Each structure stands twice: as structure tokens, then as C-alpha cells.
């Protein structure tokens, strides 16, 4: 086909040009004969019939399983942080994203900044379906979803996973949970 006729065909919108077609690759007679000879041999036929097509261990194929990044069967890591300002909180979020448990000791922070930090990390923990727990006064535990957190404190009925209640629980009577240094212990649920 000449160059001019090709250009005319392209401009006219002809999708199929004379020389352009898809060739299907068919097996040659020699290949078909080899396959038939293989099947006719009783030893090969039994081996083929008894083979498991899903047995990946005996096949000479390489495994195509790819591990999840950040997930390992080795020991888990715990990151202990004692931030002095809110600017250090993205490091805690990054540790949670890397599936590390984070313990925050907020005694060195200003009370307003500490409350903001807890809210920020709690939001990040919620976003990754993680768990959060108050460990002590101004000390909090944040864990990714791959970590089970249980509590064996005497005020709970039985050890269980971390509660994920959304509403704050305040009591006017005896306090059973530790209060943060900046908290007001005389809060009511409706004030």
C-alpha cells in the first residue's frame, strides 16, 4: 500500500487498512502431534490425570504472593512519646499508620495542648479502626486494629476489648477512673 493511499484511508476514517489485520497464532502440525503422542503414552496420561492443577508447591512456578507493607509476623513495636508541644503529634499518627502501638505521656504539655493532642490522635486512631485507652493520669494508649487491647482493672466486670463509646461518661460521685491533670473532676454529663 502506498503512502498516499494510507493517508487517504486515515483521513477517511478507515479503521481496517488492507495490510493491517490481526493474525491468530495457531499451533503447527508438529506441536499437535507432540501433544497427541504425550497423551497416548499411558505413563504420561496417568501422571497428567493424577496431577493436581492447584498444587503450587510441585509446580516450577515462582510464588506471586506479595506481603502487606507494614505487617510482619515478627514482634510488635511500641512507641513511647512524651511530647512537649502539639507539633510532635504527626509522628504519633505516622507510628499508628505503621501499625505501632503508641503510648502518650502528656504530663509535659500544657493542658489545652494536651487535650488537643488527645483529640487529634483519637481521631487518627478512629480512622484506622484502632483502639484507645486511658492508662493513667495524662497517659494514653493508642493501638492499631491489629493489636488487641484488654484491661484487667478491678472496676470492670471482665477483661474485654477496649470500649469504643462515643459519649463521654462523667460521674458526680466516686471517680473510678483517673482524671487528667488538666481535667475538672466536677463535670456533669449535661453542663
UniProtKB/Swiss-Prot annotation:
It is found in: Cytoplasm. One of its GO terms (cellular component) is cytoplasm. Cell division protein that is part of the divisome complex and is recruited early to the Z-ring. Probably stimulates Z-ring formation, perhaps through the cross-linking of FtsZ protofilaments. Its function overlaps with FtsA. The gene is sepF. Residues 151-191 are annotated as: Disordered. GO terms for biological process: division septum assembly; FtsZ-dependent cytokinesis. InterPro entries: Cell_div_SepF, Cell_div_SepF/SepF-rel, SepF-like_sf. Keywords: Cell cycle, Cell division, Cytoplasm, Septation. Belongs to the SepF family. It comes from the Bacteria. Residues 151-164 have a biased composition (Low complexity). Homodimer. Interacts with FtsZ. This is Cell division protein SepF. It holds the Pfam family SepF. Residues 165-178 have a biased composition (Polar residues).
Amino acid at each position: 500500500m502506498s503512502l498516499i493511499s494510507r493517508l487517504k484511508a486515515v483521513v477517511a476514517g478507515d479503521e481496517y487498512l488492507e495490510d493491517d489485520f490481526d493474525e491468530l497464532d495457531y499451533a503447527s502440525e508438529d506441536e499437535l502431534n507432540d501433544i497427541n503422542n504425550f497423551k497416548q503414552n499411558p505413563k504420561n496420561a496417568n501422571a497428567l490425570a493424577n496431577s493436581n492443577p492447584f498444587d503450587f508447591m510441585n509446580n516450577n512456578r515462582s510464588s506471586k504472593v506479595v506481603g502487606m507493607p507494614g505487617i510482619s509476623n515478627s514482634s510488635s513495636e511500641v512507641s513511647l512519646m512524651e511530647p512537649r508541644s502539639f507539633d510532635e503529634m504527626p509522628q504519633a499518627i505516622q507510628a499508628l499508620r505503621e501499625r505501632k502501638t503508641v503510648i502518650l505521656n502528656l504530663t509535659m504539655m500544657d493542658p489545652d495542648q494536651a487535650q488537643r493532642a488527645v483529640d487529634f490522635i483519637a481521631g487518627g486512631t478512629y480512622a484506622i479502626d484502632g483502639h484507645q485507652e486511658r492508662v493513667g493520669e495524662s497517659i494514653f494508649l493508642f493501638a492499631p486494629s491489629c493489636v488487641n487491647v484488654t484491661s484487667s482493672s478491678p472496676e470492670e466486670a471482665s477483661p474485654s476489648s477496649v470500649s469504643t463509646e462515643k459519649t463521654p461518661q462523667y460521674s458526680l460521685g466516686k471517680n473510678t477512673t483517673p482524671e487528667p491533670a488538666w481535667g475538672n473532676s466536677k463535670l456533669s454529663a449535661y453542663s
